[in-house]
Design a protein with these regions (language model features):
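Mg2+-dependent endonuclease catalytic cores in nucleic-acid-processing enzymes, primarily RNase H-like
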Residues: 1-116, 139-140
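Phosphate/NTP-binding elements of NTP-utilizing enzymes
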Residues: 35-38, 126-133
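Acidic two-metal-ion nuclease catalytic site recognized across multiple nuclease folds
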Residues: 134-147
Length: 147
C-alpha cells in the first residue's frame, strides 16, 4: 500500500507538472486546477489509504469515491462531447486513445447497448476517464446543447 501511495502521488505530481496551473505563496497553494481525484468505490480500503497519502502531499486536493453513474450515460455524454467538437485527448495519453478505439458493444446482449467488458479491451482506462467527468456530465451536456 505504501508503494502504491507513493506511485500514485508521484503520478499526481507528474500531472501537476505537465498540466497544472498553480498559484502559490511560499508553500501555500492558493489555487491549483488539479484539484480532485476519484477512485473506484469498490476499493474502499485502498481509496482511504490513497486519500491519506494525497492529503499529506497535496492538502488542497479532494479525494472522493467515483459516483459510478450509469455506464451508458457516461458513454453518451462522451459521444456528445466528441460530436460537438468539444473533446480532445492529449498526445501523451495513448492508453486512453487505444481504449476508445478498441471499445465495442457486447454483441451477446440484444435488448440494450452494453459495452463489452470481458478483458479483451481496456475498459479500466475508459472507466477512469469517465469517473473524472461524471460529476459534471449534466453541465457538459447542457453546454453542448447550447452550441
Amino acid at each position: 500500500s505504501n508503494m502504491l501511495n507513493q506511485l500514485f502521488c508521484d503520478f499526481l505530481q507528474e500531472v501537476i507538472d505537465q498540466y497544472g496551473v498553480i498559484v502559490k505563496h511560499g508553500d501555500y497553494v492558493e489555487y491549483c486546477n488539479v484539484e480532485s481525484v476519484y477512485y473506484d468505490n469498490a476499493e474502499t480500503v485502498l481509496g482511504n489509504s490513497i486519500r491519506n497519502a494525497v492529503e499529506k502531499r497535496f492538502p488542497w486536493m479532494i479525494v472522493r469515491k467515483a459516483k459510478k453513474a450509469s455506464i451508458i450515460d457516461r458513454i453518451r455524454c462522451t459521444v456528445r462531447l466528441m460530436g460537438a467538437g468539444r473533446f480532445w485527448i492529449t498526445e501523451d495519453c495513448k492508453s486512453l486513445q487505444t481504449a476508445f478505439s478498441d471499445a465495442v458493444w457486447n454483441k451477446d446482449v440484444k435488448d440494450k447497448d452494453e459495452r463489452l467488458d470481458d478483458g479483451s479491451t481496456d475498459i479500466d482506462s475508459l472507466d477512469a476517464f469517465e469517473y473524472t467527468i461524471e460529476r459534471d456530465m449534466r453541465d457538459l451536456i447542457e453546454e453542448v446543447e447550447d452550441v
